[in-house]
Amino acid sequence: MTTTLYTGFHQLVTGDVAGTVLNGVDILVRDGEIIGLGPDLPRTLAPIGVGQEQGVEVVNCRGLTAYPGLINTHHHFFQAFVRNLAPLDWTQLDVLAWLRKIYPVFALVDEDCIYHSTVVSMAELIKHGCTTAFDHQYNYSRRGGPFLVDRQFDAANLLGLRFHAGRGCITLPMAEGSTIPDAMRESTDTFLADCERLVSRFHDPRPFAMQRVVVAPSSPVIAYPETFVESARLARHLGVSLHTHLGEGETPAMVARFGERSLDWCENRGFVGPDVWLAHGWEFTAADIARLAATGTGVAHCPAPVFLVGAEVTDIPAMAAAGVRVGFGVDGHASNDSSNLAECIRLAYLLQCLKASERQHPVPAPYDFLRMATQGGADCLNRPDLGALAVGRAADFFAVDLNRIEYIGANHDPRSLPAKVGFSGPVDMTVINGKVVWRNGEFPGLDEMELARAADGVFRRVIYGDPLVAALRRGTGVTPC
């Protein structure tokens, strides 16, 4: 049994519906669960013996403001090596041209590349207050091998991140309408068999689980219908969640191919419900949003790609008004060069403000955007044990010193600050499952520079030396160092 007392927080944003902020509080944690939350816990809990055990670790948090840990509901970790490639900017290419350029690069990925891409992405998320992350790993190229998600769990264990792994796939060949090279295609049977293997080996259904598996075919437009039908059947048999991309520009192709809009297509194949959440959704109409609410289907809103792609802005006010579960995701590095989920809170808020005059429903309050990144993410992942700071919830939180110059004049309302002002850099502390995994610019027990050097070395060996990638990097006008 491990007990830790986090003592002396200046403020604590609970993340509850009421927006409760507590002043001068401690958090008492036992085996990853919050068992006490309030002022002067050593004194108030002493009569019942709580926190009096031998060996209680005390962590001084004086001057810090605590927030519930952020929950990332959509990412593609494997794309870390295509960041900051200006020749691949969406502003210069149509979608098909972009796909023709980017997917041959993705096909270079091997097992080491997946591992180090995952370390890089997870570490950046943690530095900015993320405590739980879902990754949609659909890249199974010929070079990758069958154990890519296994290596992602290795990375999560190294860093201490709570991890939901999405085992994705592409099953439709290019000859039948897919835009993805056949070298990255799998059969439905191969995909489903590996989902079963991963669930058997890694999925933990218990409260406070650190690792879970999600069945996540990539998109209806690049998969056979039976891939989705059988995915839904298998996931419900195994008791795990489902995820895919939807409403991100594929609807015209779906109507042309099947005579159905994307969401209707999914509903007719059993791929909606309280165990399903969908990435993006900027194409969803009022009728679609009503169906999402009626079926209990969630949405992962990724604001950063909207700026890059110039697409429609997901109607978050309408979804909120309808009661749709909404969480936030950073998305992959190919459409968001950053893994900073805290930044996405402010981006999402600003996007909705930009579109406010065109919307039927008002923009949610700034605090609601923090809740989408916390409780909303927990709801999408079906994790009632996460998303807020309260007794009985997981001890996942981050903390920031709001007395710095960049927050002066704004720190009177810590609830609204993440959306209105944003955090200017890494947080001061991130705690996951009751353990400090990031504090004062360091990953305890790990050498960040060594992690960076190892990843860079693999990227140089596997990716940057390839003639195609070398040409793309030269296209920036800068000689790679």
UniProtKB/Swiss-Prot annotation:
It catalyses: hydroxyatrazine + H2O + H(+) = N-isopropylammelide + ethylamine. Keywords: Cytoplasm, Hydrolase, Metal-binding, Plasmid, Zinc. It comes from the Bacteria. It is found in: Cytoplasm. GO terms for cellular component: cytoplasm. Zn(2+) binds at H74, H76, H245, D331. Its cofactor is Zn(2+). InterPro entries: Amidohydro-rel (IPR006680), Metal-dep_hydrolase_composite (IPR011059), Metal_Hydrolase (IPR032466), MTA/SAH_deaminase (IPR050287). CDD domains: ATZ_TRZ_like. Optimum pH is 6.5-7.5. Its EC number is 3.5.4.43. One of its GO terms (biological process) is atrazine catabolic process. Pathway: Xenobiotic degradation; atrazine degradation; cyanurate from atrazine: step 2/3. Belongs to the metallo-dependent hydrolases superfamily. ATZ/TRZ family. Catalyzes the deamination reaction of hydroxyatrazine to N-isopropylammelide (dihydroxy-isopropyl-atrazine). The enzyme is also capable of catalyzing some dechlorinating reactions. Homodimer. This is Hydroxydechloroatrazine ethylaminohydrolase. It comes from Pseudomonas sp. (strain ADP). The lineage of its organism: Bacteria, Pseudomonadati, Pseudomonadota, Gammaproteobacteria, Pseudomonadales. The gene is atzB.
